[in-house]
C-alpha cells in the first residue's frame, strides 16, 4: 500500500509541476551573450610594462591594462514585425597587477556602459527602423589598431535609427554627455549638463563598391543659473562636429577616407584622437579644428595583409594660451599567416605633434614604436579572435621628452604575452 501511495504522490507531483515548468520554459527568452576582453602580462626596461601614446603609435605591444566588457541582451517580445529588445553591458578595467582586483583603493573600476530598450516594427512603412531609449554605445566608428573611436557620441539618450530614406537610412538621436568637475569655484555644483543632437545619413553608394556616411553632432552645454552667475568656463558656446566618410572595396579589402570639422569645445577632438567629447575645462569659444583620416585593410597576398591608419589633425585656439596645434600619426600592422592558426605580426607607428603658443614659444612631441609578435588565433582572417600574442616592442621619444623609467629615459622596451577576444 505504501508503494501505491508513493506512486500516486509522484504522479500527482509530476502533474502539478509539468504545466508550471512548461510555462516557465516558454517564458524564458533567449539570452544573447557578447563581450570583449584583453589581458596579459609584461615587463619593460624598468619594471612593469610601459604604455605610451598608443592612440598615435599603435596598441600592439603597447597596452598595460586588463579590460573587459560583458553584454547580455534579449528579445523579450516578438510578434509579426514587432520586437522589443533589452540590452545591457558592464565593463571592468584594472592594471592586472594582482590576483584579486576589486574596487578597494581603486584597484579595479567597474562601469555601467549600456542599459537600453530597442523597439523595431512600430514605424509605419519601415519595419527595420528602430526606436530606442536608455544608455548605449551609439553607432561608434572604430580604428582598431590604435584603439580610437573617431566618431563616438555615446551615453544616455533616445532616438530613431536606420529609417530608410532614399538610397540610404537616416538616424536621429538625443544623447547626454556631461562634463564633471569643471570649475572649483562652484562648490557642489561643478558638473555641467551637456546634450547632443546627432543626425546621420548612411548607406548611399555613389558608385559600385563604395559606401558613405555623413553626420552632424551639435553639442549644447546646459548650465545652471548658479553656474551662469560665475561665468568663466561656464560661458561655453554650443559646438558642432561635421563628419563625412567614403569607403571603397579595394583589392579584396577596403579603403576609407574620413573628413571632419569641429569648433568650440569639440575642436580638440581633431588633435586628441577623440570622438566627440566636449571640452569644458578650457576657454574654447574661438576654437576650430579639422581632421583627415585614411585607413584600410588590404590583402597583399593570400597570406599577407596590411592594416593602416593615417591621421592628420589641426586645431586653433583650443586653450586660452594655445595658438595652433598640428598632429600627424601613421600606424601600420602587417600580418603573415604561417597556418590557419599561427601568424607573424609586425606593427610600426610614428607621430609628430606641435603646439604653438600665443607667446611665441612651442612644444613638440614625437615618437616611434616597433613591435613584432607571434600570434595564435582561431582562424586566418586579419581580425580573427580570440588571439594570443607573444610580443616584443621598442618605444622611443624622438623629442627627448624622457617619458620612461621614472622620467629618466627617452626609450624603453616591452616584452610580454597578451590575449584579446570579442564574441
From Swiss-Prot:
This is Maltoporin 1. Its main location: membrane. InterPro entries: G_neg_Bact_CarbUptk_Porin, Maltoporin, Porin_LamB, Porin_LamB_sf. Homotrimer formed of three 18-stranded antiparallel beta-barrels, containing three independent channels. Induction: By maltose. GO terms for biological process: monoatomic ion transport. One of its GO terms (cellular component) is pore complex. GO terms for molecular function: maltodextrin transmembrane transporter activity; maltose transporting porin activity. Residues 1-23 form the signal peptide. It catalyses: beta-maltose(in) = beta-maltose(out). It is a multi-pass membrane protein. It comes from Klebsiella pneumoniae subsp. pneumoniae (strain ATCC 700721 / MGH 78578). The record marks 36, 67, 254, 422 as: Greasy slide, important in sugar transport. It comes from the Bacteria. Involved in the transport of maltose and maltodextrins. Belongs to the porin LamB (TC 1.B.3) family. Keywords: Cell outer membrane, Ion transport, Membrane, Porin, Signal, Sugar transport, Transmembrane, Transmembrane beta strand, Transport. Pfam families: LamB. It is found in: Cell outer membrane.
